[in-house]
């Protein structure tokens, strides 16, 4: 039995060696994954001695950028925490815009600046506008008297034929021509009015005829101080009222206690006498 076992083992080993030789001749280099967790690979080389070569796992390329949604939450919080500075800068920018005078603000249109100046400096703008408008209309009327014809200019601009025909066939004469020129020069008139208003306001403020408006920041600060004072006064009043009520209730309770003490003492005396 022992001899049979040894023969069988030798035959099996010879078959295995033949199979391995054939496999090495068919493919000289083969790779088998050994561990899935580590990602290593084993390479078998057909040499006289069997050599097992471990290849390192592929490292991730550092040049590849991680998308924004794969970033950790801490980096996102840091990016969000940088937003208050932007908010504060926006708030300061808005306060600066609010503090600018419409006469000096060149970021808005001419008509809007004219309306804002009318709301803020209406008492100065109206006389200046009347004076400049009378000057404009007078100069245009004088030009119409001297024979200035506006119709070719209106046709060149491209105004509707209805307006051009009214000026051609009108009996108004110089007045209508002057009015047409007056309306055409509206942007120039508004610009001159704003310039005159600015100079007038500076002159009146310089000599004390017009008070300089406070800044928006100072105005809000004054209002906050006023509301704070009113709030403290109301709190003191309510505190005094509550303290007075507490004193009244304390006096009443002390009176009731004294009455009950007197009654108890009187009853004790009665019981002792009896």
From Swiss-Prot:
It is a single-pass membrane protein. Gene3D superfamilies: 6.10.140.1430. It is found in: Membrane; Mitochondrion; Cytoplasm. Residues 51-66 have a biased composition (Polar residues). Keywords: Coiled coil, Cytoplasm, Membrane, Mitochondrion, Transmembrane, Transmembrane helix. The chain crosses the membrane at residues 124-144. One of its GO terms (cellular component) is cytoplasm. This is Protein FAM210A. It comes from Xenopus tropicalis (Western clawed frog).
């Amino acid at each position: 039995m022992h001899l049979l076992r040894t023969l069988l083992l030798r035959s099996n080993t010879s078959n295995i060696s033949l199979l391995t030789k054939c496999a090495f001749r068919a493919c000289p280099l083969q790779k088998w994954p050994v561990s899935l967790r580590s990602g290593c690979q084993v390479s078998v080389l057909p040499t006289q001695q069997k050599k097992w070569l471990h290849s390192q796992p592929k490292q991730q390329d550092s040049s590849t950028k991680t998308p924004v949604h794969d970033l950790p939450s801490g980096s996102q919080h840091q990016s969000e925490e940088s937003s208050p500075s932007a908010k504060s800068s926006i708030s300061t920018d808005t306060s600066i815009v609010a503090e600018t005078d419409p006469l000096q603000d060149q970021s808005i249109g001419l008509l809007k600046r004219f309306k804002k100046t009318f709301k803020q400096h209406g008492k100065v703008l109206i006389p200046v506008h009347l004076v400049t408008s009378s000057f404009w209309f007078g100069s245009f009327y004088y030009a119409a008297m001297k024979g200035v014809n506006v119709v070719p200019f209106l046709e060149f601009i491209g105004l509707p034929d209805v307006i051009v025909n009214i000026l051609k066939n009108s009996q108004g004469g110089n007045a209508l021509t002057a009015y047409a020129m007056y309306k055409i020069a509206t942007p120039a008139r508004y610009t001159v009015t704003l310039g005159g208003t600015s100079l007038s306001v500076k002159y009146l403020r310089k000599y004390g005829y017009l008070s300089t408006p406070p800044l928006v920041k100072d105005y809000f600060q004054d209002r906050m101080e006023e509301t704070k004072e009113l709030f403290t006064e109301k709190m003191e009043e309510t505190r005094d009222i509550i303290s007075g009520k507490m004193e009244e209730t304390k006096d009443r309770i002390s009176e009731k206690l004294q009455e009950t003490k007197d009654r108890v003492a009187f009853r004790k005396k009665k019981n002792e006498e009896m």
